[in-house]
């Protein structure tokens, strides 16, 4: 997927070729088994030729001063006109959806073991800074800023290829309580 035509711009290539990246998912579309609902909104509704045309998911060192663990989760997305709220502009609600996805991934992958179930979004505040053009490329980033018991706070941003900060978010995730049955199932 790193060779997807939409990712051949100098901006995207500078991101992709960073040697510190640890790529997780490289897919244009289908990445989960057909018999599961895992991430079904993205899987069946958004990963289309006019929606999210291509995406890369990766981790890398985070340079934000408030990064709790020193790493960030990233999504590089190629967006089509099927995500528009107004012609040429991605629907504002899509920013919230992407923030929940990238921040949730960060929270889930930053949880201490044993990780059995992903954390749930408790609150999310999204500040919209700039419209996202479509078609276009964006980079969503998220990093953990605090952990307290089962509570995980994460910050995130969406930036476009023109250098615009399009949205910021602060989220609170709550890790599930683990029962003895949950732990036994893991053995």
Predicted ranges, named:
Residues 1-134, 146-187:
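Terminal targeting signals and extreme-terminal segments of soluble enzymes
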